[in-house]
Regions:
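Disulfide-stabilized extracellular recognition modules
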Residues: 86-165
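N-terminal signal peptide
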Residues: 1-17
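Mature, structured extracellular domains of secreted fungal proteins
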Residues: 32, 38, 67-71, 81, ...
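Short, well-ordered surface patches within globular domains
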Residues: 16-79
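A solvent-exposed, acidic/Ser-Thr-rich amphipathic alpha-helical stretch
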Residues: 70-96
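Short clusters of hydrophobic/aromatic residues that line enzyme substrate/ligand-binding pockets
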Residues: 47, 82, 127
Length: 165
């Protein structure tokens, strides 16, 4: 099941369609909340949701259904964060919170990851990148039963040697 590409079109539909759209809207709100709380903590403007960017992310996660590995897409004009969680119990908040948690390893003074950051902190710096204004994500339960989340950011961050904020 892929989700998160929401649009503000109500063409009626079945009760199941309405429930699915309501869940997708709640997931979008959760993802924006996790991202924007981290951005607020460092004085950066909030992100807005882009259904267009979410469409790209959804298409990409659909293509990964059979091979659930965090491999970057070819859309290099977007910044991109990926996460694979074991099992299907992962919700969008927990997945995105893992990226935000990397902030504990980021040292603004040296603009580097410090300590024993097992996965680095580039996903965190993308979340809080000052010039990034739009977010779109796609999530899927892969054939393996694991959960893959991809979030794309525009404009992309993590370029050059600049600081994120």
């Amino acid at each position: 099941m892929a989700s998160l590409c929401t649009a503000a079109i109500d063409n009626g539909g079945t009760d199941a369609d309405l429930v699915r759209r309501a869940r997708a809207a709640a997931t979008v709100a959760e993802l924006l909340s996790v991202h924007n709380e981290a951005r607020r903590a460092v004085g950066v403007e909030p992100l807005t949701w882009s259904a267009g960017i979410a469409g790209y992310a959804k298409k990409y996660v659909e293509s990964r259904r059979g091979e659930c590995v965090p491999r970057r897409s070819s859309l290099f004009y977007f910044g991109e964060n990926l996460f694979v969680g074991k099992g299907r119990h992962w919700n969008a908040t927990a997945l995105a919170a893992a990226w935000v948690d990397e902030g504990r390893w980021y040292d603004y003074g040296s603009n580097t990851c410090v300590g024993e950051a097992p996965a680095g902190c580039a996903r965190y710096t993308q979340v809080v990148w000052r010039n990034t204004t739009q977010l779109g994500c796609g999530r899927i339960v892969c054939d393996s039963g694991d959960t893959l989340l991809v979030c794309d950011y525009f404009p992309a961050g993590n370029y050059g040697t600049g600081r994120p904020y």
